[in-house]
């Protein structure tokens, strides 16, 4: 039998799209129990058989948190730290990994592409939070299932799906936020007829300038109040607009066969880089303009779901997807030209996923193909960000996961994935940089694996031990980028190989009635990591670039590091009306190669919440908190933006917040949120912009 499976893995031809789960969207108020889901207990749409810790955020929690963006969902969960460079941003940090070391996925399609960078990313805002059914946060290396980039974890966004048996259903949400005069209008409708199901949705957002908090309990009077870009507490040039659209169609051609279409479109207006506009040079603002152009994302998925049992599989899901993205960087120093650099990215992908069950055994296997094409252009006379002759990156992978019981109380899981990656970059103009090559070509491969044991010890006790590896293959951003930041010029390096993480973790769970406690301790080794180091080209260690003479740096595989930490969560069910939830996370990381602290490590953070719910009413009071990050605890590589903190580092902070909602009828819900009630001034770790001050949010949701 093993030979048949191996042959199938080698020769299967993908032909469709990954199925998505359907959960009805209804107006309701109740005590929403926070879920910690272990992979083997999740719905099959996720296809994860390894015992990674997974936290799910449901649609009702998303609505009650009133997030500004999908990155804001993660921060308000209390389980993930989020970095902000500008108002339209949000870069998740999971266990000390960020940006291209954390994988973003929507409806089974990878969002990470060939130009995801290593610093901070804002791409997660391209998914409307109101279009989501739920979000799964997968903690720890997850490369067996997801492939490259899943070093620290995975954030999987699941959008709404059309329901069967509904002639017509529509939802309308209106929301206002005082801290930025934000207006949010969302509408969707779905219907079904016979074998067909349809869903369409649109979200319009208009955000004004963001106000910071007034109360400076940290004692730093002028922190974040650069006079030329802050008026009182209003952070100027932080306004932006965004529009998101979704359309899904499902045809149940047979009882066991379905076809699907998934179309998503998102675009913003210009996003000013507040952390660049507040920079000074020789006593004057360094930039007159620094903004991202409209961030545009198109996703089209076509798919097949086949659930008729045969010798090879019980269920088969296939995803064919196409993504088209555009992003640009536009900067202008005072009395200088406006320099525009634009990237167009095209991603073609196909994932075939199979599940076979027998007795109490489950086998999941599949094939994944990803192909990225990157076109980079710039203002005439200036260099492009990436190879000006174009770049492409192709990845093909095969994977398998297996789960079986060893006894009545012990379950075993194991998995492996082999990936082959090819990257090409072509340079037409190399005179200014003096590159010793006209093209770059990399061929890398990686083998990753995972093992897990889950032991149900009895009397509500349960333990899970997991060992897993992850990898990230160098992408176009790592290999071909020409980039200036903090007075350093990054240039291409043709000698890069994948970076790997090795992780072991232990999770202990205790259930007492409807209450539970979960705690995870993890230790991770990061090997062959890609970091910037001083570099030379043709014997030169500096070059003239964009009006400055800058020292040269390049990405190299020169870092070995370790990280360890813990996450804990407690849910306390007091009675039918009252409950309390608490989360806390801590990570420590050290770069052993440089004998220095590792970057992207937030200080201890967490959330405590108490909820009351009765009939049509719900009330929640919660506190977010964050410990100090002292200046001496920052990484020396500059990735954590110490220049945006105080001279002593980033002060500790906590905010008090309120959420209350009421069902006015079966079809109408009203909600009031008051965030940062005490109007505290603070910045989240590594952020270039001050966090929102007191914010009153009014929401009205109608179903018809």
Residue ranges and their predicted role:
Residues 23, 236-238, 242, 255-315, ...:
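Flexible loop and strand-edge segments within Gram-negative outer membrane beta-barrel domains
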Residues 269, 276, 280, 324-326, ...:
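Surface-exposed extracellular loop regions of Gram-negative outer-membrane beta-barrel proteins
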Residues 21-63, 99:
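Short, acidic, small-residue-rich periplasmic hinge/interaction motif at the N-terminus
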Residues 111-139:
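Short acidic/polar hinge/loop motifs at secondary-structure boundaries
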Residues 341-354, 395-399, 491-497, 503, ...:
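Outer membrane beta-barrel strand-and-loop segments of large Gram-negative receptors
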Residues 407-408, 412, 421, 522-525, ...:
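Gram-negative outer-membrane beta-barrel transporters
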